[in-house]
Design a protein with these regions (language model features):
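Nucleotide and nucleotide-moiety/phosphate-recognizing core
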Residues: 1-175, 180-183, 190-193
Length: 193
């Protein structure tokens, strides 16, 4: 199944002291570059990649993919980035992932997409936790998401609860780098390039 990947790099990164998370380096490369490498290594790579970002747009654009700022004011969260992606690719099946999704099984996209028929959304979970921001979505959900955001909804979990949704278990632990300390800890284990 062909798909468009949407990388979320538009957050405020408040738990990282406000630095632009996608540009934080891990072993000499920004997280966005590592995530793009993880996508390129997929057994089923995307046809197109979009990057949701609200700062340093030129730095993200240098990676050669369309950069989409939020269309809603006041940084309303990752769902605003998702809405911008849906509006930019209205007929595409989307694979949404945060800019710290740099360690993915090579069949990650293929497995999520294979589970999508009969569902509106399929998200991922690993042995430690559910990852609602790692998900595949059917096209045609932009109006439902816009209505949820207009009603004041901001939570990915809350929006997923309104949809036909399934969570797919992944045996490999997926990174969740919400602090600079977590990035540094992963860097200690990172193999040399």
């Amino acid at each position: 199944m062909p798909y468009t990947a949407l990388i979320l790099a538009g957050g405020q990164a408040s738990r990282m002291g406000g630095v632009d998370k996608g540009l934080v380096e891990l072993a000499g490369q920004p997280l966005i570059a590592r995530t793009l490498q993880a996508l390129a290594a997929q057994s089923q790579p995307p046809q197109r990649i979009l990057i949701s970002a609200n700062r340093h747009l030129d730095e993200y654009a240098a990676y050669g993919h369309a950069v989409l700022p939020d269309t809603l004011p006041d940084y309303p969260g990752p769902l605003a980035g998702l809405l911008a992606g849906m509006q930019a690719a209205p007929d595409a099946t989307l694979l949404m992932l945060p800019c710290d999704a740099l360690v993915l099984p090579v069949d990650f996209a293929a497995r999520l997409l294979a589970a999508l028929p009969g569902q509106q959304v399929v998200s991922a979970s690993d042995p430690a936790q559910w990852h609602p921001s790692l998900l595949a979505l059917q096209p045609g959900l932009a109006a439902a998401l816009a209505a949820y955001l207009a009603s004041g909804g901001r939570s990915i979990r809350g929006w997923l609860a309104t949809l036909q949704h399934q969570s797919l278990h992944v045996a490999q632990k997926l990174p969740n780098l919400n602090t600079l300390a977590a990035v540094h800890q992963l860097e200690q284990q990172w193999p040399a390039d």
